């Protein structure tokens, strides 16, 4: 059994660690609430844009308009993956779940004879892609907790330009997929994979009761609005990923703090037992000495 002094030192060390994890839990809780507010603040604009895109896409399909971002390519041999991860760790299994999902996606695509390029948003995802030797076309790191839309645009531009045919009819990607953390609730954040390009018609297409009038023309509005729609979709995914990161970190630090408290209780019990054993031994030695003197 360790000495009482060593146990006291361990108790002090664990208590100090518990203070750190408690502080990180409180900071993450505050950042999570702010991230949730950011998601809610952008939702009205995103919802209205979604409604307009639903109506506009339906009209475009009915009118025979073929926008390159709406049209699937005849064959799929080159795929891009937009991978959104946190820049930092200490957020439970969130990073490992995302990187495992990315690895499964890449393996599945390669098994179908497709090449995969990655657009990484977040340091953890970028580092993972470089570590496994996968092709990295673009990266964005250090976005922070409340990134402006302009900081996200390079990733969206890379995806749009890679999917859209150039003047010669050539393009870099046949499909683009998005992998990010879906914020279900404070306790649950899970990887979410979906096709990003070509743009699919919103599920509410034709459901709106508003009769929109487009100026100067429906085609011109579609040309301008469709890239904005893609950018907003990516921006919303990033904001949701940030909320997931802080929620996962808050829960991880809460669990760490609870474990620290439990460890302190166990160490305190061990310390008390060691102290009791030392006192009992000392009393026994005194009693034995007194008995020897009386004889």
From Swiss-Prot:
It is a peripheral membrane protein. SUPFAM superfamilies: ATP synthase (F1-ATPase), gamma subunit. CDD domains: F1-ATPase_gamma (cd12151). This is ATP synthase gamma chain. It comes from Herpetosiphon aurantiacus (strain ATCC 23779 / DSM 785 / 114-95). PANTHER family: ATP SYNTHASE GAMMA CHAIN, ATP SYNTHASE SUBUNIT GAMMA, MITOCHONDRIAL. The keyword Transport applies. InterPro entries: ATP_synth_F1_ATPase_gsu, ATP_synth_F1_gsu, ATP_synth_F1_gsu_CS. GO terms for molecular function: ATP binding; proton-transporting ATP synthase activity, rotational mechanism. The keyword NAD does not apply. Belongs to the ATPase gamma chain family. GO terms for biological process: proton motive force-driven plasma membrane ATP synthesis. Keywords: ATP synthesis, Cell membrane, CF(1), Hydrogen ion transport, Ion transport, Membrane, Transport. One of its GO terms (cellular component) is proton-transporting ATP synthase complex. Its main location: membrane. It holds the Pfam family ATP-synt. Produces ATP from ADP in the presence of a proton gradient across the membrane. The gamma chain is believed to be important in regulating ATPase activity and the flow of protons through the CF(0) complex. It is found in: Cell membrane. F-type ATPases have 2 components, CF(1) - the catalytic core - and CF(0) - the membrane proton channel. CF(1) has five subunits: alpha(3), beta(3), gamma(1), delta(1), epsilon(1). CF(0) has three main subunits: a, b and c.
């Amino acid at each position: 059994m360790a000495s009482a002094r060593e146990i006291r030192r361990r108790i002090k060390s664990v208590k100090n660690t518990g203070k750190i994890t408690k502080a990180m839990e409180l900071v993450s809780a505050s950042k999570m609430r702010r991230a949730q507010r950011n998601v809610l603040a952008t939702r009205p604009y995103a919802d209205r844009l979604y409604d307009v895109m639903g109506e506009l896409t339906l009209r475009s399909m009915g009118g025979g308009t073929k926008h390159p971002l709406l049209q699937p390519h005849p064959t799929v041999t080159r795929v891009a993956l937009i991978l959104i991860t946190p820049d930092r760790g200490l957020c439970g299994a969130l990073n490992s779940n995302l990187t495992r999902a990315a690895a499964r996606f890449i393996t599945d695509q390669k098994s179908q004879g497709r090449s995969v390029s990655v657009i990484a948003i977040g340091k953890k995802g970028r580092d993972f892609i470089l570590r496994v030797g996968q092709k990295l076309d673009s990266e964005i790191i250090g976005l922070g907790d409340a990134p402006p839309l302009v900081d996200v645009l390079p990733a969206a531009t890379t995806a749009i330009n890679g999917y859209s045919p150039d003047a010669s009819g050539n393009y870099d990607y046949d499909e683009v997929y998005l992998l990010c953390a879906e914020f279900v609730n404070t306790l649950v954040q899970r990887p979410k994979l979906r096709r990003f390009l070509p743009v699919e018609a919103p599920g509410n297409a034709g459901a709106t009761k508003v009769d929109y009038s487009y100026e100067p023309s429906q085609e011109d509005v579609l040309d301008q609005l469709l890239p904005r729609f893609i950018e907003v979709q990516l921006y919303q995914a990033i904001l949701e990923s940030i909320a997931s990161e802080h929620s996962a970190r808050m829960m991880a630090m809460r669990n760490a703090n609870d474990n620290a408290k439990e460890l302190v209780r166990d160490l305190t019990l061990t310390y008390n037992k060691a102290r009791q054993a030392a006192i009992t031994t000392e009393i026994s030695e005194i009693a034995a000495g007194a008995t020897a003197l009386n004889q």
